[in-house]
């Protein structure tokens, strides 16, 4: 998302080879690349750095074994499907997806900020973490899980986060999330925690 957010005019701190000391960049291509799981991309700052990735086994019973990756030989179908997904999306598709995700994230962030007892941690773009100083945030997580929201609990500080994806940009999803989250807060405030 970061390169597309930058192209869309969002203020993004440098994160790539423009930063001194960055020697490689890896990206899983399934979540925001819209490819099948099982593919990733790794970029090296130079060819000299890439040579350290090669895997060699000199004691293999079949003879000398060399591979560009530790995983060895793999079917090409995953790579082909990743390539097809990226070609299909194109720059225009990725920009549009990023725009939708970032706009949805802003709406969700604003909605969370309007709920008493919750506050946003940091200044997120699309991975939004929220916490509470007055109620048990993990009970909020439990309530939201029962409503079929896929959120993650964090600690230090105790918080919950949602990673906004293209699925969240569909009509009505933002409103449903904020409604369920509001109900979760009301429930936790009214219903005492079970002992045990």
Stretches with model-predicted labels:
Residues 1-70:
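Conserved PLP-enzyme active-site core in the AAT-like
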Residues 13-15, 28-30, 68-71, 115-119, ...:
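Generic recognition of flexible, low-complexity loop/linker segments
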Residues 28-30, 44-47, 85, 131-133, ...:
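Structured loops at beta-to-helix junctions and adjacent beta-edge loops in soluble globular domains
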Residues 32-33, 38-43, 61-129, 158:
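Structural motif of enzymes handling amino- and sulfur-group chemistry
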Residues 55-59, 71-75, 159-162, 193-195:
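Short C-terminal domain-edge/linker segments immediately following a structured domain
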Residues 92-98, 105-107, 114, 122-125, ...:
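Non-catalytic terminal extensions of PLP-dependent enzymes
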């Amino acid at each position: 998302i970061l390169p597309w957010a930058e192209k869309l005019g969002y203020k993004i701190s440098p994160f790539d080879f423009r930063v001194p000391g960055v020697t490689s960049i890896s990206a899983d291509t399934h979540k925001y690349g819209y490819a099948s799981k099982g593919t990733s991309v790794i970029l090296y700052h130079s060819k000299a750095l890439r040579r350290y990735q090669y895997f060699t086994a000199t004691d293999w019973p079949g003879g000398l074994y060399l591979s560009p990756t530790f995983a060895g030989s793999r079917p090409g179908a995953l790579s082909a499907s990743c390539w097809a997904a990226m070609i299909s999306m194109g720059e225009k598709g990725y920009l549009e997806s990023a725009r939708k995700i970032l706009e949805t994230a802003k709406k969700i962030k604003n909605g969370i900020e309007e709920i008493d007892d919750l506050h946003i941690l940091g200044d997120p773009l699309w991975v939004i973490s929220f916490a509470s100083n007055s109620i048990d945030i993990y009970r909020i997580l439990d309530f939201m899980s029962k409503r079929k929201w896929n959120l993650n609990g964090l600690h230090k500080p105790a918080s919950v986060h949602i990673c906004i994806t293209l699925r969240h940009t569909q009509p009505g999803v933002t409103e449903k999330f904020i409604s369920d989250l509001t109900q979760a807060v009301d429930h936790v405030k009214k219903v005492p925690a079970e002992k045990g």
